[in-house]
């Protein structure tokens, strides 16, 4: 065990990227069902599509999984509303400041990780 496996309650310290256009429920549930942390890539999904993928994730796995949300997404209010309503437990944020949404997500017992870039190196920081 290490800090990643303990934090997310996963078997292996593997986190799939929340890649736009390809990180849907099938890929994310496959990663989660095999001991990693699968992430839905919300950046390319309209709110209704994201909601559908979240519901399919709930059906496809009982293992931990999360969503990667680019904070520059134009419909963030709707995305956050869906995340709260559908009881998502883990949210990775990127592409913007997490300050506006982190307190609300944490208040609802959601683990929040912000992914940011420094120059060419990508870093992950638990908020």
Model regions: which residues?
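Active-site entrance/lid segments in N-terminal catalytic domains of soluble metabolic enzymes
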Residues: 1-126
């Amino acid at each position: 065990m290490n800090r990643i496996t303990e934090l997310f309650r996963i078997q292996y310290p593997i986190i799939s990227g929340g890649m736009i256009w390809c990180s849907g429920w099938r890929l994310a549930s496959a990663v989660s069902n095999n001991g990693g942390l699968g992430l839905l890539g919300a950046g390319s999904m309209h709110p209704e599509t994201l909601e559908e993928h979240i519901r399919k994730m709930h059906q496809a796995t009982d293992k931990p999984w999360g969503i990667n949300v680019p904070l520059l997404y134009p419909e963030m209010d709707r995305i956050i509303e869906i995340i709260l309503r559908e009881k998502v437990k883990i949210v990775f944020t990127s592409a913007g400041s997490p300050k506006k949404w982190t307190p609300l997500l944490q208040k609802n017992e959601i683990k929040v990780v912000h992914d940011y870039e420094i120059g060419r190196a990508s870093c992950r920081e638990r908020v």
